[in-house]
């Protein structure tokens, strides 16, 4: 491989900035004489990326917000494509944010540049025809999960399973006693974590339901305590409003600290989403619940091809953790499903441990190796 390797990376949100910085460290460890260009956040810039514009300009959530910013996003993407084609990097890596990065990858590949996509979109679950666009856009997909890699292999897309970075960050055995001490929770007695999501809409749909479930469980188990990590000040205020006028609960609200809550608890009532992977890695028995607007649910039922909604079940390939969705998610049903797991969640935990070890691949190192192998092939 020639000296002076030039690598372009494009990340669009905070999670991509974390993945990108880890990948950059691993690439530099293998190839010290390397230049990074593209778009990234503060972590990637700290690793030496010359970002063409602030990553925050790509971080847009919600249909209305996207439509409002669409002209700017399209203009930035067009300029970025032109700039990268002129820069002729040895490889371009799009990190997540597929609605933006796949279009960049496609144009660069048409211009004869090598392209990689890091973090698979959920094509295995819905809009599966997107795999055709992915096959045209990138020379290599870097997948965080083995079931994603199998999906791409079946559809003729070059893929490398690299593992998940969190599997290396989170210890195989978390120290429950130490986490409780840090949170000021009693060392003995049972603790249930309530995790109704990080977005306002999720908390609006699930917050009161989770609190109702907690009150039911407290009647059965008077010594039970609860901990609820709030993703932001707005989410904390939302929960505090829901607590007004209720029977008192032995509930500790946390500012962030979701990992501490998972380490400290005995079991989790959790919204479907990426937090279920964190709960799995902390080996905490869980029940997954989710509610959306009725029309949204009917549309998703028609679109989604996967039999499961939670990552633990997708990774296990079977119904390992209970999923109570929409009308099935009632306080009575959730309490009845959680209660046995507070007594014995060993069946879930055994599978969680095996999955954790399978995902513990040192994702950044694996991804760097795959990228450099791609560069060397030409």
UniProtKB/Swiss-Prot annotation:
MF terms (GO), sorted A to Z: lipid-A-disaccharide synthase activity; phospholipid binding
> Which InterPro entries does the entry mention?
Glyco_trans_19
Q: Which reaction does it catalyse?
A: a lipid X + a UDP-2-N,3-O-bis[(3R)-3-hydroxyacyl]-alpha-D-glucosamine = a lipid A disaccharide + UDP + H(+)
**Which protein, by its recorded name, is this?**
Lipid-A-disaccharide synthase
Which family does the similarity line name? Belongs to the LpxB family.
Record pathway: Bacterial outer membrane biogenesis; LPS lipid A biosynthesis
Q: Give the species this sequence originates from.
A: Pseudomonas aeruginosa (strain ATCC 15692 / DSM 22644 / CIP 104116 / JCM 14847 / LMG 12228 / 1C / PRS 101 / PAO1)
Domain of life of the source: Bacteria
Class in the EC hierarchy, top level = transferase
Q: Which Pfam families match?
A: LpxB
- Enzyme Commission numbers on file: 2.4.1.182
